[in-house]
Amino acid sequence: MKVVVGMSGGVDSSVTALLLKQQGYEVTGLFMKNWEDDDDDEYCSTRQDLVDVASVCDVIGIDLEVVNFSAEYKDRVFADFLREYEAGRTPNPDILCNSEIKFRCFLDHAMQLGAERIATGHYAQVREWINDGRSEFQLLKAEDGTKDQSYFLYRLNQAQLAKTLFPLGGLYKREVRKIAEAAGLHVATKKDSTGICFIGERPFREFLMRYLPTKPGEIRCLDDDRVLGEHQGLMYHTIGQRKGLHIGGIKGNQDEAGEHEAWYVAKKDVKANVLYVVQGHDHPALLKDRLLATDLNWIAGRDPRTHWVYTAKPRYRTADMPCEIDALGEGRAEIAFATPQWALTPGQSVVVYESKVCLGGGVIV
């Protein structure tokens, strides 16, 4: 069986290709170039990543293909990213990149190369099972809970999962590095990439200012509406943000120890261009026990059961929280949590699970 592996130059995708080759698959590596604006930028690692991929493919003994999806990325991912920030929301472009680029453009290209499956270095698992006499594919959490990436894959569908392999889903990160080291892959100790793929390690505000001009407005206290300062643009702030407000010297509420409590972003009024803040991490305005989600994707192709207790992540790297789902139709649902959740953020994704199975999710309104 021919498998095309999406390779980034990191240890995860490198070991993915290695394991599949060892298992007898006909493997081809494919390097995707998804961003061109910063080819000569100090933060851009694309050239070195391609060098690393070529070296790994040479050691493993597989062919390498290079494809440029920059135009598709700008149209399907980056344009949405800018629209969301302009609207005062906080999007997660990595989720859209997965569904639109890595598991659509890449998948289509791999099929044109004659592949029967694609594979990536994501920490997740795919399971095929028979439901009412029909074959169905489930997305499961990875064995390594600290690296699980199912949250970022919730927008995948049955057709995409049916063609996808996740060889690292049953492994721990330390095992992956050991496998790479034993095989003589120089990327065994390479640092994991962080941040949004097209931003890399650069300061986020600096990057965003290149595409969205500053739009100063007032910072107001949500409790008494007094003006506390000025912001340079609502897009530079997110719900629950504490740092970078430049109002720390303004006193107000005190905690039990007599210390003045920190200010947190609680609300954005896009029409008035006002940023509202509150004092104290546990201020009631930062705690909500329900949310409205839209643009829903249920991996099985059907709504989950109503009045059934599931769990959900309202952001990445948070614990799964018990909840109930009320499907409202037209791609919307209300999710009610058993306990109040902190800083629910419009634009972020809420992802629903039943035990280890990722059911899907949507975007917080």
Swiss-Prot record:
Enzyme Commission number(s) from the entry: 2.8.1.13
Location(s) in or outside the cell: Cytoplasm
Major subcellular site: cytoplasm
BP-aspect Gene Ontology terms: tRNA wobble position uridine thiolation
Reaction catalyzed: S-sulfanyl-L-cysteinyl-[protein] + uridine(34) in tRNA + AH2 + ATP = 2-thiouridine(34) in tRNA + L-cysteinyl-[protein] + A + AMP + diphosphate + H(+)
Source taxon at top rank: Bacteria
Family annotation (CDD domains): MnmA_TRMU-like
Protein residues bound to ATP: 6-13, 32, 121
Keywords: ATP-binding, Cytoplasm, Disulfide bond, Nucleotide-binding, RNA-binding, Transferase, tRNA processing, tRNA-binding
GO terms for cellular component: cytoplasm
Disulfide bonds: 97-197
Enzyme class, spelled out: transferase
Region (Interaction with tRNA) location: 147-149, 315-316
Record bears the keyword rRNA-binding: no
Site feature (Interaction with tRNA) residues: 122, 348
Residue ranges of the region described as Interaction with target base in tRNA: 92-94
Catalytic machinery residues: 97, 197
GO molecular function: ATP binding; tRNA binding; tRNA-uridine 2-sulfurtransferase activity
Family per record: Belongs to the MnmA/TRMU family.
Function: Catalyzes the 2-thiolation of uridine at the wobble position (U34) of tRNA, leading to the formation of s(2)U34.
Name of the molecule in the record: tRNA-specific 2-thiouridylase MnmA
Gene (UniProt): mnmA
